[in-house]
């Protein structure tokens, strides 16, 4: 894996039932990070199978189990900052925010991202959460690093000029 941790929100976890592990690639699987405020993800889902280390951020007090750690945070406060504080305390120095759109928007709005890998396809979606929109200030500091197209899909990598520092 290229990153220390990979994160999804509740809705993406419920809709996709992702594994968030390494497949067809060498190296260790990243730590799985899930934002599940009310603990609505069923125990039968892959994220809770205990095969890989998993951190669940929630508002509930829950006992940990094998390879699944429940971390209680205040959802009335700055959620993203709290998540990053806990990840930094665990020496997890890189985080891939897989999605969904609401979670990605939260990171963009908190201005705590330094690279975006964007995949687009010739498909128009008319429902769901809109993709992140960047304001004029954010756009002025962004550079496009590379573009690649494969079978009607475009892959782009964007970088900001800033460096994200841990909150601690």
For the regions a language model picked out, list residue spans one by one.
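Enzymes that bind and transform nitrogen-containing heteroaromatic metabolites
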Residues: 1-168
């Amino acid at each position: 894996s290229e990153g220390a941790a990979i994160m999804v929100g509740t809705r993406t976890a419920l809709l996709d039932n992702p594994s968030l592990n390494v497949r067809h690639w060498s190296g260790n699987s990243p730590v799985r990070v899930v934002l599940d405020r009310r603990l609505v993800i069923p125990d039968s889902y892959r994220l809770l199978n205990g095969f890989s280390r998993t951190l669940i951020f929630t508002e509930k007090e829950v006992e940990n189990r094998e390879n699944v750690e429940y971390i209680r945070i205040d959802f009335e406060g700055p959620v993203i900052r709290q998540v990053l504080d806990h990840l930094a305390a665990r020496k997890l120095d890189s985080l891939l925010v897989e999605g969904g759109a609401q979670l990605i928007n939260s990171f963009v709005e908190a201005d705590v991202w330094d690279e975006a890998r964007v995949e687009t396809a010739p498909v128009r979606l008319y429902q769901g959460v809109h993709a992140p929109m960047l304001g004029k200030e954010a756009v002025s500091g962004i550079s496009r690093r590379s573009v690649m197209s494969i079978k009607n899909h475009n892959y782009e990598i964007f970088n900001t000029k800033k460096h994200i520092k841990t909150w601690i």
